[in-house]
Each structure stands twice: as structure tokens, then as C-alpha cells.
Amino acid sequence: MKKFCLLFVLFFSVSVLDVTAQQDSTKPEKKSSSKSKIQYGLASFYSNKFNGRKTANGEIFSNQKLTAAHNTLPLGTYVRVTNLRNKRSVVVKINDRLHHKNKRIIDLSRAAATKLGFIKSGLTRVKVEVLGKKPPSK
């Protein structure tokens, strides 16, 4: 009788877990860009050693372009990055990903970091505003 009860409880538990897993898989995946249009955090910029390497979207990285790496925004998204220390801002295209253990929210090209004025410090606090998939009109 104890074995029967144990088997029944085990079977019931597995059935409940299976139903729960199926329900979770039908929920649409939440995208970072649709939930939060503004993020705050720490920014850095690419080392020169990455020049000429492929980015996550297949483009060749150039420190002279206004591009950036971000872990949750869709590739091809344009964002406005504002340096919170000096209020300078720049629009960049997300074309790469950060290392998954990186605590920064964005890694910018050298050109973008120069426009934001943090080459000497190497890091700065920023505001990142999602603009969308189309480049902003100038």
C-alpha cells in the first residue's frame, strides 16, 4: 500500500510539472526593448583588438562607426546613449553582444565613447533610450 501511495504521488507530481511546463511554453517571450524603453547603468568601450572582427549580426566591427554591444536589445536596434556625467549623447546601432558575465549594460565603439567624452576614464554611467529599428532622421 505504501508503494502504491508513493507511486501515485510521484506520478501526480510529474503530471502537474508537465502541465505547468506546457502552460509556461505557450506564454509569449517578453522582450527587453518592449518592456523598458530606458535603462541606466555602466558603459565601457571596445578595445582596439576587436577592430576587423565579426560582430553578432555578422558585420565587421570598426571603432570608427557608431555601434554598440547590448545583451538584451534586438540586434539592429538604434539607441540614444547619454553620458550622465556631462549630458553628452550619441545615437548608436546595436550590432553585437556583451560577454554574458559582463556587468555593464552597453559596450560602445571608440567613436561613440569619444563623442560621449569618456575615453580617459574608460567607464561612465549612462542612460540608454530605445529609439527603434529605423535610424533616426538627422
Give residue spans per PLM region.
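Secreted/periplasmic proteins
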Residues: 2-6, 10, 18-138
